[in-house]
Amino acid sequence: MKKLITFIFISLFFEVPMNSQSLDLINPSNEIGIKNWTIINDDVMGGVSNSAVLINNKKNLIFKGYISLENNGGFASSRLEIRKKNLDGIRFFEIKLKGDGNNYKLRLRQKNMRASYSCDFKSQKNKWIIVKLPVEDFRPTWRGYTYSNYPRLELDKINSLGLHISDKQEGKFNLEVEYIKAVK
């Protein structure tokens, strides 16, 4: 009985959702397949940055490469199509990662939409952290511009997600991801 009262107290005062559910979007140990990732770097507009997606021996996803500012470049990204999942009611996306101190974006795309919906997060150098990105923080962006008059993100229409770096800092980058989850 004492445990039940403690749980209710914590739930009420610390807003722990009693019906919180998570849905794995990326869990590299589930054999997501490297060949399913698409790389889109600034070479599409004349830049020379490069990136790759790998799976390390711990079965974590590695997004790494080199950002070059040459030819007005400065970004690298990766994208994975996701199978139709029920994302209705999602409150936030959770990423467990170890980074290099750079800023990154989680990008969500909807079918037949030019823009993607992005949310920024900062990694910490050589330290595992969990970042939570609320759905309402995702903004429609295209080619580096944010749009205020674009339709709202519709979770049931998401068909891909990706990782993106565009902080205009030349040099190597390395992001290790254990998982990306959608949390209700």
What are these regions (language model features)?
Residues M1-L4, Q21:
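Positively charged n-region of N-terminal signal peptides that target proteins for export
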Residues P17-K184:
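Beta-rich carbohydrate-recognition modules and glycan-binding surfaces
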